[in-house]
Amino acid sequence: MRFRYFLVKKDWRSTMVQNSCWQSKSHKVKAFTLLESLLALIVISGGLLLFQAMSQLLISEVRYQQQSEQKEWLLFVDQLEVELDRSQFEKVEGNRLYMKQDGKDIAIGKSKSDDFRKTNARGRGYQPMVYGLKSVRITEDNQLVRFHFQFQKGLEREFIYRVEKEKS
């Protein structure tokens, strides 16, 4: 690309500058206008505010779920304690606790699914006490029955209960 230089003895540089300005005026330069820039800033700001609001909502939901799990555990422990208080301990066998309640043989332990149930001694009947269990380990040692619970969500809890064996 060759440029034409107008040779004017007096000031050839000013003529060249005028020529280049004239050329740039004839071509449209693509750029953002002030209105477009303002609109882009508003869209970006709105997107960031939306992202912040969604993050706070997610954090509050996680906190609620953690509190809900804790409340569910406390409710289960209260229910289990009531069942154990009104029963007479017999034995722990096969990861199940066997006891007598109101003259009936009762067993509590983890079922084949993901819940902890109260059943009769033969495994019949159905009263779920807590859901979402991965595993349960029930052991008895020196009049202490230990329940070790692992939940599917990663929560681990242990419940220890003192029993009195009936003297024969």
Swiss-Prot record:
It is a single-pass membrane protein. The transformation pili are flexible filaments, consisting mainly of the major pilin ComGC and smaller amounts of the minor pilins, including at least ComGD, ComGF and ComGG, and perhaps ComGE. Interacts with ComGD. Interacts with ComGE. Interacts with ComGG. The chain crosses the membrane at residues 31-51. Disulfide bonds: none annotated. Keywords: Cell membrane, Competence, Fimbrium, Membrane, Transmembrane, Transmembrane helix. Pfam families: ComGF. GO terms for cellular component: pilus; plasma membrane. The keyword Membrane applies. GO terms for biological process: establishment of competence for transformation. Its main location: membrane. The lineage of its organism: Bacteria, Bacillati, Bacillota, Bacilli, Lactobacillales. It is found in: Cell membrane; Fimbrium. Required for formation of the type IV-like pilus (T4P) that plays a role in transformation. Transformation pili are dynamically extended and retracted, perhaps thereby promoting DNA uptake and transformation. Involved in transformation. Required for DNA binding. It comes from the Bacteria. The keyword Transmembrane helix applies. The gene is comGF. This is Competence protein ComGF.
